[in-house]
Amino acid sequence: MSEQTIYGANTPGGSGPRTKIRTHHLQRWKADGHKWAMLTAYDYSTARIFDEAGIPVLLVGDSAANVVYGYDTTVPISIDELIPLVRGVVRGAPHALVVADLPFGSYEAGPTAALAAATRFLKDGGAHAVKLEGGERVAEQIACLTAAGIPVMAHIGFTPQSVNTLGGFRVQGRGDAAEQTIADAIAVAEAGAFAVVMEMVPAELATQITGKLTIPTVGIGAGPNCDGQVLVWQDMAGFSGAKTARFVKRYADVGGELRRAAMQYAQEVAGGVFPADEHSF
């Protein structure tokens, strides 16, 4: 019997037995032309919901710096702040592939530092893979991790950890810079990455790279032709502030509903409406 996935019959959107998603499923989906979704997750409860919804890949992103800890950028967050979040997500999502971000400062020094950081996420956090930002400049780190048996998702284009160097949140790979983005994509693939995130890259360039690579591409602000797509769940579900990036589509108003529920709860407590007899022993 062939191995089944969360989607059933190994195809996104299908039905059937639910088993663990592995990196080879993503490779197969690329070969078969099946697109798939990835979301961030930072705790047990939301990870459980996303797993039940059939999201095959969950990213414990360093975006937790913004949406969990309230930092202005992703730069300050540490391994020690991320690992407890990874543990919760892994427990809540028995079927999804859980990828953990290596935070700024944990891998730039070279392969030895990258291996130490990634090992912590797998051993202490239970992550199934790690993600790190950069193209050619981190190819050696990627090769080291994959040689050690650690699956790596790469991240090129706009890399949030380099926001200060890049001069803010800007589209990458326009004009002459396109060749460097292509070189970065090829470098991470040749180093052994099982997939590559492309952030804020022109759609035409992302399409070209997706066609060149044998590994899956994951877009975030990179057009519709990547093999997968990823969003921060708070942006996707309307839980973050009113202003979001152009590439975000809101599928709900979770923030508004939570605010309404909290206000109603407070009003009913103040007015003596809650708890009522049916809520008492």
From Swiss-Prot:
Binds 1 Mg(2+) ion per subunit. Can also use Co(2+), Zn(2+), Ni(2+) and Ca(2+) to a lesser extent. It is an enzyme of class 2 (transferase). It is found in: Cytoplasm. Optimum pH is 7.0-7.5. One of its GO terms (molecular function) is magnesium ion binding. Pupylated at an undetermined lysine residue by the prokaryotic ubiquitin-like protein Pup with the help of the ligase PafA, which leads to its degradation by the proteasome. The cross-link involves the side-chain carboxylate of the C-terminal glutamate of Pup and the side-chain amino group of a lysine in PanB. Pfam families: Pantoate_transf. 3-methyl-2-oxobutanoate binds at D62, S63, D101, K131. This is 3-methyl-2-oxobutanoate hydroxymethyltransferase. The gene is panB.
